Every structure is written in structure tokens, then in C-alpha cells.
Curated annotation (Swiss-Prot):
Domain Flavodoxin-like positions: 276-415
Cofactor annotation: FMN; Fe cation
Organism, scientific name: Rhodobacter capsulatus (strain ATCC BAA-309 / NBRC 16581 / SB1003)
Binding partners and assembly: Homodimer.
Lineage: Bacteria, Pseudomonadati, Pseudomonadota, Alphaproteobacteria, Rhodobacterales
Protein name from the UniProt record: Type A flavoprotein fprA
């Protein structure tokens, strides 16, 4: 199948990801796709870090099951990863936990390549699959399944749990007891793209997890509560959602977290790690390059959790809880008409509603003529009682290789200030004004 190439917007940071499948558990592989450039999902939801379309292959002694697929534009990535772990004639089962297009874009072609496969989904999903396949629907072994039913792969079974309206009528979960993996599709998902895939390896995605819940699951919270009741007795060790990080570290915490989100927000903790959030807006990609370099430098510290956000793709309000809990923030902006861009000022204005006193602050950006934006942002950060241990970093036009290294060094210094490895220092108003 011919799939058009996908090009990331120049202003978006490119997150390196796996080129092949990724082992999730014995006999279980991630075969999905990364979409780091996505900035708006389903019209209603901004995606500052893009998203992932998680699909999985499960191997048993008598065949392979494929659980969900990907958005059509990324079918090529999906098939390449799937072919690395299975032949098409080995595919015995295709499980569709949810029929939304971002999970079924490769289904027609997958069935063409593996026509012998059984297709199992919730009964409410049958009309939607018929609409997707049109006249081809009758060609395949397609059946609805309900809670408690299962399909054997020989030495392991996949059991189904009907969880309607989480967030479509057709949604279900699939349980692999042999490896304690629960495939939940949109439940426990988040629009957060990070090529490291697992929740114990990626950046801080709490904001995305909660924002996703607020925008997608909250209108169906009574159904979410019923779904949690249904799956809570399972002894799962991994939650494998269809979007965002795979939850292999303390997965039950996310169930508890979701219960709390049904009625109230959860103030999560990051343990002994320090957290640095980097927000930026980029006109021609130069500030984005600088932001990525600062991120990479700071991320070299094992004691600092660093997250990078493109504010062009996100609303500001969902970030406020995250900023309030963070130890430091760095803001990047180009200089346009002698000023920082509007989105950065909107974020700075929103910070008056949260506690910022004593947090580490920093500013950076590219410019063409005068370069006042960094200085103006620094002044406002000081007005918010944040501490600025490093003078802001400015680059004229696009950064050179040497200037990108300066960005990485800037990030390393910010991390050192957060962890106490650097001597305390405070940039004062006179130093800012002098620039």
C-alpha cells in the first residue's frame, strides 16, 4: 500500500523514536506510529507534543494477534513494524478495541494482507466496521464479543471486557493474563509523543494525561467509573493504551489517578527529581532548534526531568498546574516588532494565578534585528519573583552548530542550578538592562 510521506513542521521538535517494533512484554510488541507534529486532535483538543498511535502484536503458540492499528497516514510505519515480528499468514486474530479512524486507518489493508484472520470487536462496533469496509465486510470472519469471552492463541488467551462510552459506544478492553498486560485503547491514554514510549522513560506527561481526560473522558465520567470497576480486579502489570506512554511503572496508580479525576484534580509528585519545563513559540524554526538544544543539555542530568512544549499547539490553562508543581521553567520567543510574541505574554499573564515565587526562570530566543524579547521576558519573570540564575540566551537568525552547543550548555547549567551543583547566582535588573 502506498502511503504518502509524513513531514514534521519545521517549528516542531523532532523526537527520535524507534525505527522498528518495541518489546513490551514477552511475546508482545508495540507496532504503532509516532506523530510528533500533530497540533490539533479531533478539532477539540490541542496537542503540544503530538501523539502516538499505539498498536500491538501478541504472539502465541498458535498464531499472532494484532490489537488495533493506526491512522491511515501512518500505515506504512505500522506495516513495517508488524512485518518485523510476524508474517501475515501467521495472523490469527485482529482485535479492534475502538473503531475511531485513528485506530482503524490500516484495517482494510491489514485484512487484505491477512484475510484469514478473525476480527473481534464489541457488538456496538459492528455497524461502524461495516461502514468502514463497505461491501468487503461479508468477506471476513467478523464477530462481536462481550465481557468474559476470549480467543485462544494456543498457550495464551485474550479476554475481552466491554467498556462502552469510554468515549465511544463501541469501546472495549482486552486482557492478556499470561503477561498481565491490559490493552485499554483510549482509556488511560494521553496525546503525548515521546519516542522512548514507556512512562518511566518519557518526560512529564501528567498535564497531557489530565488534559486528555478533561477533553475526552470527562463527559463520560460515569461510564469511565463503570469501566474502572470492571477492570480493577485484574492483576495487571502493564497498561497498554492506544495513545501516549505505555504504563509499565506503577500502572495501578493511573487507575487511582483516573478515579480522582472523575471528581477532582490530583496533585501528582515527581519524587526526588527536579522538573524543568521548556515552553517556546517559533516563527521560522530557529527558536524551536534552540529549545531542543536546551532540552537535550538539561536532560543529560539524571536528576532532572525535562519536558519540552510548543505553545503553538497547546492552550495555556492546562499547563498551569504543571508549572505550579515544577521547579523551573524556561520560555523561548522570537523578537517580533521589538517584543515577545503574544502567546508568551499570555502565558506570563496567566502565571499570576499560581505560586511562582522562588522557582527557577530563564528566557531564550532568536531574533533578526533588535532582540528585545528575551530581556522583556526576563524582566517579567523577575516581577513574578522567580530567580534567574543565568542571563538569557539569544541567537541571531538560525543557530549555528556552535550556538546549538551553547544552547546545550545553557540547559546543562540550568539543570545544575536546579540540583544545587552550581553555585547560587541571581541575575539582577541592571544586568538585564545592560543587554
Amino acid at each position: 500500500m502506498s502511503v504518502p510521506p509524513f513531514t514534521i513542521r519545521p517549528a516542531a521538535p523532532r523526537l527520535d523514536g524507534p525505527t522498528g517494533p518495541v518489546a513490551v512484554a514477552p511475546g508482545v510488541h508495540w507496532v504503532g506510529a509516532l506523530d510528533p507534529g500533530l497540533r490539533n486532535f479531533d478539532v477539540i483538543l490541542k496537542t503540544a507534543n503530538g501523539t502516538t498511535y499505539n498498536a500491538y502484536a501478541v504472539r502465541g503458540s498458535e498464531g499472532v494477534a494484532v490489537i488495533d492499528t493506526v491512522k491511515a497516514e501512518f500505515a506504512g510505519d505500522f506495516f513495517a513494524r508488524l512485518e518485523a515480528v510476524a508474517r501475515y499468514d501467521e495472523i490469527r486474530l485482529i482485535v479492534l478495541n475502538h473503531l475511531e479512524p485513528d485506530h482503524t486507518g490500516a484495517v482494510p489493508e491489514l485484512l487484505r494482507r491477512a484475510p484469514q484472520a478473525q476480527v473481534r470487536l464489541s457488538p456496538r462496533g459492528l455497524p461502524m466496521l461495516r461502514a468502514l469496509l463497505k461491501d468487503d465486510f461479508e468477506r471476513y470472519d467478523i464477530k462481536g464479543v462481550t465481557t468474559g469471552q476470549s480467543v485462544s492463541l494456543g498457550d495464551r488467551d485474550l479476554q475481552f471486557f466491554t467498556t462502552p462510552f469510554v468515549h465511544w459506544p463501541d469501546t472495549q478492553c482486552t486482557w492478556l493474563a499470561a503477561e498481565r498486560v491490559l490493552f485499554t485503547c483510549d482509556l488511560f491514554g494521553s496525546h503525548y509523543c515521546d519516542g522512548r514510549l514507556f512512562n518511566d522513560l518519557v518526560g512529564d506527561f501528567r498535564f497531557s494525561f489530565e488534559y486528555y481526560f478533561d477533553r475526552i473522558m470527562r463527559p463520560f465520567r460515569s461510564f469511565v467509573a463503570q469501566a474502572l470497576d470492571l477492570i480493577e480486579p485484574l492483576d495487571f502489570g502493564i497498561i497498554a493504551p492506544a495513545h501516549g506512554p505505555i504504563l509499565r511503572s506503577h500502572p495501578r496508580d493511573y487507575l487511582t489517578h483516573t478515579r480522582r479525576l472523575i471528581s477532582s484534580r490530583l496533585a501528582a509528585e515527581t519524587g526526588s527529581e527536579k522538573t524543568l519545563l521548556i515552553f517556546y513559540v517559533s516563527a521560522y524554526g530557529a527558536t524551536a532548534q534552540l529549545a531542543q538544544a536546551i532540552h537535550d543539555g538539561a536532560a543529560e542530568s539524571p536528576d532532572v526531568r525535562v519536558s519540552l512544549f510548543d505553545l503553538e499547539g497547546g492552550e495555556i490553562t492546562p499547563f498551569l498546574d504543571l508549572i505550579e508543581e515544577a521547579d523551573g521553567i524556561a520560555l523561548g520567543t522570537p523578537t517580533i516588532n521589538g517584543d515577545a510574541v503574544r502567546t508568551i505574554w499570555e502565558m506570563l499573564a496567566a502565571l499570576v494565578d499560581i505560586e511562582t515565587r522562588g522557582k527557577l526562570g530563564a528566557a531564550f530566543g532568536s531574533y533578526g534585528w533588535s532582540g528585545e524579547a528575551v530581556r522583556l521576558v526576563e524582566t517579567r519573570l523577575q516581577g513574578l519573583k522567580m530567580r534567574l540564575p543565568e542571563p538569557g540566551l539569544r541567537v541571531k537568525l538560525h543557530p549555528s552548530a556552535a550556538e546549538l552547543e551553547e544552547g546545550r550548555a545553557f540547559g546543562r547549567r540550568l539543570a545544575d542550578h536546579l540540583t544545587g551543583r552550581a553555585a547560587p547566582r541571581e541575575v539582577d535588573f541592571a544586568e538585564i538592562a545592560a543587554r
